[in-house]
UniProtKB/Swiss-Prot annotation:
The gene is queA. It comes from the Bacteria. The lineage of its organism: Bacteria, Pseudomonadati, Pseudomonadota, Alphaproteobacteria, Hyphomicrobiales. It catalyses: 7-aminomethyl-7-carbaguanosine(34) in tRNA + S-adenosyl-L-methionine = epoxyqueuosine(34) in tRNA + adenine + L-methionine + 2 H(+). Belongs to the QueA family. Transfers and isomerizes the ribose moiety from AdoMet to the 7-aminomethyl group of 7-deazaguanine (preQ1-tRNA) to give epoxyqueuosine (oQ-tRNA). This is S-adenosylmethionine:tRNA ribosyltransferase-isomerase. It comes from Allorhizobium ampelinum (strain ATCC BAA-846 / DSM 112012 / S4). Pfam families: Queuosine_synth. InterPro entries: QueA, QueA_dom1, QueA_dom2, QueA_sf. Pathway: tRNA modification; tRNA-queuosine biosynthesis.
C-alpha cells in the first residue's frame, strides 16, 4: 500500500507535552467500526463500562530505562567529538544496539566515553545504528547507565522542551517492572490505582506480557510503499502461564483487550493460526498493515499516533483505514491531545 494513504495534517497545538492529571482523566475516544454509534467521546476512567466481566486486559510491564547517553568519541589521532547515543536493544550482558548521532562521525573500533562509562563500537550498521560493547556488564552496567543516562523523550516532545525530573515518573506506567524499554508503552500511562480497583470490581482480568520497546518505534517510514519498509526488532516474552490464562479467557467467551500496540504486536506474534496463544521469548519485527488477519486481540486501547507511522497503519488494519481517518479527523477537530502524553482511544476490531 502507498504510505501516503496514512498521512494527515496535525496542528502543533494537538501535541501533548505533559500527561493528564490524574492520568485516568484523559479523554477517551470510543471507536466502533461496525456499531450504530461509530465515535463516542468519553474519559479513560470510564473504561470498565465498555468491557464485560470475563474480558482480560493485557498490559506490557516493560520499564523505561534512562537510555539516552551523551558522550565523547575517542579516536587515536583525531579530535574528541561529542556524540549522542540512544540504546534500543540489549544483545548481551555488556552489549547494546544503539542509534548514534551524528552517525557519520563514528566507525567500528572507536571508543565512546559517556561521563566515565566507556564503550567500544563493536559494529556499525545502517542509518546510524551501532553495537556498543561496554566495559561494565550485567547489573554493574545497569547501575552505570542509570547514573549517566537520561529518559529518552520522544522527538516530538524533546524538540519542544528538555527532559526534567517529572518525566522519570510521568513516562513510566504504575505497573512497570521489567527493565529494558527505551520508550514507554504509552496506552498504559493512563492507568491509576483507582482505575485498577474499578476494573477488579467489574470482573475484568489483568495479565502481563513484556515487550521492550526500542527507539525504532520513533523511526519514520521513508519508503513510498509499505512493502518496502523494514520493521525494527524488539525483544518480547509471553510466559506459559499467561498464554494458558488468555486461552482460557477466549474459551469462556471473553475478549482479549490489548493495552497498547506493543502488547498487541507481541500477542499477535505469539498466536498460532487458529488464534491459540503459545509461550514466546524472542525478537519480533511484526509489521501490521491493512489486510492483516488478527488472530488474538479483540479490542485495542491505544493513544493517537503520528502521520504515516507504522502504528497508524496498525490501527488502520485493526479498525479500518476509513474509520480511523474519520476518528482522527474528529479527534483533531475536537482538540484531543496526541502522542505519548496525549489522550487515548478504545478500538473495537472491524471484522467485516
Amino acid at each position: 500500500m502507498r504510505v501516503d494513504l496514512f498521512d494527515f495534517d496535525l496542528p502543533d497545538e494537538n501535541i501533548a507535552l505533559r500527561p493528564a492529571n490524574p492520568r485516568d482523566q484523559a479523554r477517551f475516544l470510543i471507536v466502533r467500526p461496525d456499531g450504530s454509534l461509530m465515535l463516542e467521546d468519553r474519559r479513560v476512567f470510564e473504561l470498565p463500562s465498555f468491557l464485560r466481566a470475563g474480558d482480560a486486559l493485557v498490559f506490557n510491564d516493560t520499564k523505561v530505562i534512562p537510555a539516552q547517553l551523551e558522550g565523547v568519541r575517542i579516536r587515536e589521532g583525531a579530535e574528541r567529538t561529542p556524540v549522542s547515543c540512544t540504546l534500543h536493544m540489549r544483545v548481551a550482558a555488556n552489549r547494546w544496539k544503539a542509534f548514534a548521532r551524528p552517525g557519520k562521525r563514528i566507525k567500528q573500533g572507536d571508543v565512546i566515553d559517556f561521563d566515565g562509562l566507556s564503550a567500544n563500537v563493536a559494529e556499525k550498521g545502517e542509518a546510524g545504528e551501532i553495537d556498543l560493547e561496554f566495559a561494565a556488564s550485567g547489573p554493574d552496567l545497569d547501575r552505570a547507565i542509570a547514573g549517566v543516562g537520561h529518559i529518552p523523550l520522544p522527538p516530538y516532545i524533546a524538540a519542544k522542551r528538555p527532559e526534567d525530573s517529572q518525566d522519570r515518573t510521568d513516562y513510566q506506567t504504575i505497573y512497570a517492572r521489567e527493565e529494558g524499554a527505551v520508550a514507554a508503552p504509552t496506552a498504559g500511562l493512563h492507568f491509576t490505582p483507582a482505575l485498577f480497583e474499578a476494573l477488579d470490581k467489574a470482573g475484568i482480568e489483568r495479565h502481563f506480557v513484556t515487550l521492550h520497546v526500542g527507539a525504532g518505534t520513533f523511526l519514520p517510514v521513508k519508503a513510498d510503499d509499505t512493502d518496502d519498509h523494514k520493521m525494527h526488532q524488539e525483544i518480547g516474552h509471553v510466559s506459559a502461564e499467561t498464554a494458558e490464562a488468555l486461552n482460557a479467557v477466549k474459551a469462556r467467551g471473553g475478549r482479549i483487550v490489548s493495552v497498547g500496540t506493543t502488547s498487541l504486536r507481541l500477542l499477535e506474534s505469539a498466536a498460532s493460526e487458529d488464534g491459540r496463544l503459545l509461550p514466546w521469548s524472542d525478537a519480533t519485527g511484526i509489521f501490521i498493515t491493512p489486510g492483516y488477519r488478527f488472530k488474538a486481540v479483540d479490542v485495542l486501547m491505544t493513544n493517537f499516533h503520528l502521520p504515516k507511522s507504522t502504528l497508524f497503519m496498525l490501527v488502520s488494519a485493526f479498525a479500518g483505514l476509513e474509520t480511523m481517518r474519520a476518528a482522527y479527523a474528529h479527534a483533531i477537530e475536537t482538540g484531543y491531545r496526541f502522542y505519548s502524553y496525549g489522550d487515548s482511544s478504545l478500538l473495537f476490531r472491524k471484522d467485516k
